[in-house]
Amino acid sequence: MTELLKTWLTQGPAGQQLISFNHHDIVTGSLFATQVYHLHQRLQARPEKRWLLACDSSDLFAVGLCAALLSGKQIILPANTQPGTLSELTQEFDAIVSDRPLCEGKIWLELKKELSLPHSPWPQMAEGDGFGELLLFTSGSSGQPKAVRKRLQQLDAEVSVLEQTFAAHLPHCSVIATVSHQHIYGLLFKILWPLAASRPFLSDLVEYPETLSYYTALFPNLCLISSPAQLSRLPDAVEHERQLHTPSLIFSSGGPLSLEAAQGVKRCYGSLPIEVYGSTETGGIGYRRQQSSDTPWQAFAPMELSNDSDGALLLRSPYLEDNGQYRCEDKVRLLGEGQFCLEGRLDRIVKIEEKRLSLVQMETLLNAHPWVTQSHLVLLENPRVQLGAAVELSTAGKAQLEAEGKLSINNALKAHLLSQFERVTLPRRWRYPQQLPLNAQGKLLKNDILELFDHD
């Protein structure tokens, strides 16, 4: 297998390689190398090994990522920069590389574009030095943030396979994304793969349909990195925007894409998006273009698939540490020739707006509120995917409900959850039964809880 990413990181970009762009600026390989060199020097002078990296601008993030990898540092990527999230991770990092201060009491190296720096070459690693590694934090099944370590060789294996699989469809393409680079999907598809394959990427996040239309009109060859939540809204969003060009390729990952959404994208742009199935732990496992609801997935070339007695997917992959085996919490039906169908989750990790969410973790935080005795969260899928919260209130909570009403309770509990969770992941529907439904063994009756949400 080629070492596309390692080769690029060792040699650095060509001086005239276009690294990134936005509507008013470009970053060339020469400028990028200079920025990486000077941050690398600052990191090398620091004894701290574990550096939290967070930055909204993708070109500055890439500077921080490359400098830290070449310095042999461990790079901590939080799921988000909410105060509660960073507080939970405070023992996991020693210092911060960011465009803004995030935590008091931690060493902070500021990421900023400095055009006055003297021209400098790409940093060279000393013989015997190793590349740094990444530590990504996701929602573990226990409800606590789970650390997922990624060595360069694992990321390199995936970048190389992506290039081998899709390069023929990406002639002279630029890359734009509606997803964050702080998560594994955006990190790979928006930052690492484009860098290694010399494809320029948009440094800003595409947040509005008119921005998408602007860049599709500007570039005849464009690759769009997106997610189901955003693609499902695309047909309505671009209905009144004349499309001069269409993306050469559209990727979707981070959660299931409905058949309706896939067909909607085809109506907009003339081709189906390529869905990528995987996780932070596994990287990409398979891909498909959804012609019908039962279109099977095709495993990427190096994957070895099997399943256990529960139907859970067992995976062997070079993207895993030591090329080991991993048990996924997805039930699958294997079809042969690397094809498979997904048949649902076996745990309580869900995706809300492509944000990976532990229901256990959110319930634990809810239950810590003085107005709550016990809570249970359910995923509601009609009329759209959203979270429902069934909450048994404490005596104080019931008094508040009686005095101030349901809306007051809703808002207070949402504010409580915002200390650790992003707003888009919060429950949209709330129920306050006198007691949560239990069976004789004290187990929650899920169907009875779902019935609480049958009527508004």
Language-model features: where?
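Conserved pre-ATP/AMP-binding loop-to-beta segment of ANL
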Residues: 3-16, 115, 119-137, 168-175
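Conserved AMP-binding/adenylate-forming core of the ANL superfamily
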Residues: 6-7, 14-45, 150-153
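Conserved AMP-binding A3 loop
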Residues: 26-29, 133-160
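Conserved AMP-binding/adenylate-forming
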Residues: 41-81, 173-181
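Conserved AMP-binding/adenylation subdomain of ANL enzymes
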Residues: 157-174, 182-223
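Gly/Ser/Thr-rich phosphate-binding loop
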Residues: 237-293, 304-306
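AMP-binding/adenylate-forming catalytic core of the ANL superfamily
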Residues: 331-425
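Conserved C-terminal "lid"/linker of ANL adenylate-forming enzymes
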Residues: 350, 390, 413-456
